[in-house]
Amino acid sequence: MAELSIASGIVGLLSLGIQVTQSLISFYSAYKDQDGDLAKITQNFEDLQGIFQSLESAVQDRQSQGDMDEVLKEVDKAMQGCHEIIEELQKECQKLHTDLGLSLKGHIQVAGRRAAYPFRKSTLQKLKEDTARNQNQLDLFLHSLPKDLDETYERILCSIDENYVDDVCRILTLLCFSARPLTINELIDAHAVDLSASPHLDREGRSYEQNDLIDICLGLIEISKTEDSGQQLLIARIAHFSVQEYLQSERIQQQKANRFAIQSGPANTEITQICLVYLLEPMLSSGVLDTIKIKEFPLAHFAAEYWYHHYVNSREGRLKVEELLQRLFQYDTNCFVTWIRIYGLDRQGTLRPNSDYQRPIDDIGSPFYYASLLGLESTLSNMIAAGARDASFLEMVNAQSGEYGNALQAASSGGHWKVVQMLLDQGADVNAQSGRYGNALHAASSRGHKKVVQMLLDHGANVSTQGRELTLW
């Protein structure tokens, strides 16, 4: 609606400009044969009218292109000069005619009653200069109009204060690639994560407010209201899909705004880092975990549930987050337990709640188990390297743990064949009975992971264990 209002105002103003210049052309045309100056002035008015018509056409063309809110705002801003020019033309028109509604014939009759040449040379000279100046201004304005959305977005991005460039890049990255829409409070906390040499949640950055984000992003984002379980939420979004398309396009790479370009791999890597740093925040894991604590850390649920989604989509950027993963999957920290309590990923597909803030420790699998469930090869490899010399390591490999019973069944259910091979190499019991599927072979078969099924069979998996029916393919 705002877009239509802006467009209507611009078109209305230009239409008035066309009307006024037509009236002036009609008047001066009656005299233009008497003096070269009058002929020049008439031509100037005709040129002005042509520019107004071109501007009107340009605005209407842009309006028809779809979401052109930012283009029209740019046009409206630049139209301030047109306001002044048209007001000046109106005053000139009012000097000559008390009634703009007179027909051309009426103007000629009025002119005929005047003296044969009622114009002063000084007046004509000034009018000629004024119309030429107005023509130049409008012509410059016409050529300065953004040709399309790309040029509009480029101008907006290049006009962002240098002090806020990194902030805007972070915000746009989050909104373009977050696994689900972010609330304004989630976005503020995600923006507040400092990924410098010592990654941490920056207290000062958390003091941002909704209007701060909107102001520095110059119309590239918007806030909408929605309801979830009766609670009203403010959701932050990219203002239009065309903004995201431009930011991810190859075109932006060739433009001045190229530092704002966003690519899937690096963007997902950055969001993975943000989520992991947030989960490693000491204050989140200290004290009692309850709804009050979660309210203090609004990004906690998103970070707990979606860091793995973004990790998978990081591609070659996964190595950059390995150190953070090692910290999260440590045995002697509360961060790991807090993560699982916020989002128990192994409870997916069960009747048990994913979020269980008071989930007993003995109901939570080991970091080794969850690394196997997610197929985190590097993380698991480091754990194996660190624990291989420990006499109790084999017990950990086969430990009864979590919804899937043990690490091998967890890895098999996800089809993580490389992890399955690592576990088998470490002596994992291929026929261990426990968990959701009973054993690793049934887990792999039920999920259609043929390669894992074959690997388990090659290592002695018993097809008829406990009488379960096994479908191999």
UniProtKB/Swiss-Prot annotation:
SMART domains: ANK. As colorants, MonAzPs are widely used in various food products for centuries. Moreover, MonAzPs also possess wide-ranging biological activities such as antibacterial activity, preventing hypertension, lowering cholesterol levels, causing hypolipidemic effects, and displaying antiobesity and antitumor activities. Keywords: ANK repeat, Glycoprotein, Pigment, Repeat, Signal. Residues 1-23 form the signal peptide. ANK repeats lie at residues 403-432, 436-465. Coiled coil: none annotated. InterPro entries: Ankyrin_rpt, Ankyrin_rpt-contain_sf, PigL_N. Glycans are attached at N462. Gene3D superfamilies: Ankyrin repeat-containing domain. Induction: Expression seems not to be regulated by the azaphilone pigments (MonAzPs) gene cluster-specific transcription regulator pigB. It holds the Pfam family Ank_2. One of its GO terms (molecular function) is pigment binding. It comes from the Eukaryota. Part of the gene cluster that mediates the biosynthesis of azaphilone pigments (MonAzPs), a complex mixture of compounds with a common azaphilone skeleton very widely used as food colorants. Seems not to play a direct role in the biosynthesis but might have a regulatorx function. This is Azaphilone pigments biosynthesis cluster protein L. The gene is pigL.
